[in-house]
Amino acid sequence: MKINELDTLFHLSKSPDITKLTPKVPSKVASRENAFEDSTIERVSFAPSIKGCILGLQLSKDDFINGEVVLYVYSPYDLDEQKIVNNEVIVGKKLVFDANVTKECWYLREASVELLGSITVYDKVEQTIEYTPIRVGNPKFLKPNGKLDTYLYKYKWNQ
């Protein structure tokens, strides 16, 4: 299965010493009325880009200390392709409201990962991304054009 041009997936965490990731329902499952994320399937979420990972984290002001947060970048290895739920399935089944933006995929078993490095994410918006959510709970939250905004925060790789 071709993931991206590098065949690489990424996962971000605040923990610097992970070697394995265990499937679970994310602690920040989108519970807003205008959003939807599956709350039943235990999974490890990956994205084919760092930006997709940042968008998928749904960072809030509480995540930043002095205007920044350090996140550790992991990449999985030795994945069983049969246990990957690809982005097309997530989007097609409307499992995550913004999967069409994050391009996330899921792994349904424990995943071995290697640490690639760390990034610092700043609470400054680099780009506002307007998108059509896959599923909407309450249309009153939509803009008049039927879309939502999400924010990509600035980040840099640490030395």
Per-segment meaning from a language model:
Residues 1-43, 58-59:
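ADP-ribose/NAD+-binding catalytic cleft of ART/PARP-like enzymes
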Residues 2-5, 36-44, 50-159:
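Conserved NAD+-utilizing ADP-ribose enzyme module
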